[in-house]
């Protein structure tokens, strides 16, 4: 598998950590959010990687906790006229693409994603233009502009199946933006894959030697790994999969202890699924390095109770997602291709 570009040369500045709230303040904002959701005919959709108190609030108010695509699909089917998206900006864009008639609000539009930041549209479009014989497949963790440049959008849950399908048709692939997921898919399928060189700042930090030491401490533990992790981590795994697939694996594996190599935000729903099991964080520090993300996306952490309340109350340019109509049409085509393909897998 060839490599052409290394956006990892860029260091993305992290946002400041949110100011902690007192218990009284948390209760105040929880009640305010519940009231505002009713007043605005809104529903809250939260990603697995948001903080536990945010996921809990989404549950309590009849919302959704899931991966980015299922968040958008839930919102599209829901009767609410407004969606409050607790996640990062590309998730709000995806929701707007699938529900253009709805108001899409976010706690902050400054919640970025290193995969999105690492795949700027101008550079990526030039990369695609240099390889016109290849089918362009992009991960859901990309901007609306990058999606519109692609032939297919894909989630980690069906990435292997889609690339197998395209390979069976004799197609050569451009994969973007996550190099680790692209490498995993290529090894699983044997397809001709040309990879963009982005990475998730959370999964890229997992350390092999530190994980080996942890496995010695917990020799009977199973290792669950998201395929955005480095190859050396994936090769150690007992189960590899998307967020929803890892939760399913936690339920089906017989092990009583689980080491989890993905954002620790997933622990909220995973522990609900397996309350009898012990969940352990895979190490992101060690081997001469300290952690930057420390197994939690700093932009996901921006989705606090106060910010959610402000997003619902204020709306406007600081909180509302807008997607240009022409760009939306361009991004909707590869998204719909993926949805149709996923439907054939479920049939």
From Swiss-Prot:
One of its GO terms (biological process) is 'de novo' NAD biosynthetic process from L-aspartate. One of its GO terms (molecular function) is metal ion binding. Keywords: 4Fe-4S, Cytoplasm, Iron, Iron-sulfur, Metal-binding, Pyridine nucleotide biosynthesis, Transferase. Binds 1 [4Fe-4S] cluster per subunit. It catalyses: iminosuccinate + dihydroxyacetone phosphate = quinolinate + phosphate + 2 H2O + H(+). [4Fe-4S] cluster binds at residues 113, 200, 297. Its cofactor is [4Fe-4S] cluster. Iminosuccinate binds at residues 47, 68, 139-141, 156, 226-228, 243. GO terms for cellular component: cytosol. Its EC number is 2.5.1.72. It holds the Pfam family NadA. It is found in: Cytoplasm. InterPro entries: NadA, NadA_sf, Quinolinate_synth_A_type1. Disulfide bonds: none annotated. Its main location: cytoplasm. Pathway: Cofactor biosynthesis; NAD(+) biosynthesis; quinolinate from iminoaspartate: step 1/1. It comes from the Bacteria. Catalyzes the condensation of iminoaspartate with dihydroxyacetone phosphate to form quinolinate. NCBIfam families: nadA (TIGR00550), PRK09375.1-1 (NF006877), PRK09375.1-2 (NF006878). Belongs to the quinolinate synthase family. Type 1 subfamily. PANTHER family: QUINOLINATE SYNTHASE, CHLOROPLASTIC, QUINOLINATE SYNTHETASE A. This is Quinolinate synthase. The gene is nadA.
């Amino acid at each position: 598998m060839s490599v052409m570009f290394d956006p990892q040369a860029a260091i993305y500045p992290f946002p400041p950590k949110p100011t902690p709230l007192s218990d009284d303040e948390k209760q105040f904002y929880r009640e305010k959010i519940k009231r505002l959701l009713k007043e605005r005919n809104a529903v809250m959709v939260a990603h697995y990687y948001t903080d536990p108190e945010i996921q809990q609030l989404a549950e309590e108010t009849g919302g959704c906790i899931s991966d980015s695509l299922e968040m958008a699909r839930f919102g599209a089917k829901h009767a609410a006229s407004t969606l409050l998206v607790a996640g990062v900006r590309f998730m709000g864009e995806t929701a707007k693409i699938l529900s253009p008639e709805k108001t899409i609000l976010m706690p902050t539009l400054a919640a970025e994603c290193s995969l999105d930041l690492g795949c700027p549209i101008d550079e990526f479009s030039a990369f695609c233009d240099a390889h016109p014989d290849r089918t362009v497949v992009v991960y859901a963790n990309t901007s609306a502009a990058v999606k519109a440049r692609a032939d297919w959008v894909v989630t980690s849950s069906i990435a292997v199946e889609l690339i197998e399908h395209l390979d069976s048709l004799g197609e050569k692939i451009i994969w973007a933006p996550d190099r680790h997921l692209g490498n995993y898919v290529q090894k699983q399928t044997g397809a001709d894959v040309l990879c963009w060189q982005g990475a998730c700042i959370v999964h890229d930090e997992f350390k092999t030697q530190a994980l080996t030491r942890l496995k010695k401490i917990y020799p009977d533990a199973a290792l669950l790994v998201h395929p955005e992790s480095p190859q050396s981590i994936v090769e150690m795994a007992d189960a590899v999969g998307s967020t929803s697939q890892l939760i399913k694996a936690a339920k089906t594996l017989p092990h009583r202890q689980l080491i989890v190599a993905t954002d620790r935000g997933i622990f909220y729903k995973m522990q609900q699924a397996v309350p009898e099991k012990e969940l352990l964080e895979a190490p992101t520090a060690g081997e001469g390095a300290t952690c930057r993300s420390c197994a939690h996306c700093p932009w996901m952490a921006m989705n606090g109770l106060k910010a959610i309340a402000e997003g619902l109350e204020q709306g406007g340019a600081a909180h509302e997602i807008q997607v240009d109509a022409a760009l939306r049409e361009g991004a909707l085509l590869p998204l719909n291709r993926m949805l149709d393909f996923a439907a054939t897998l479920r049939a």
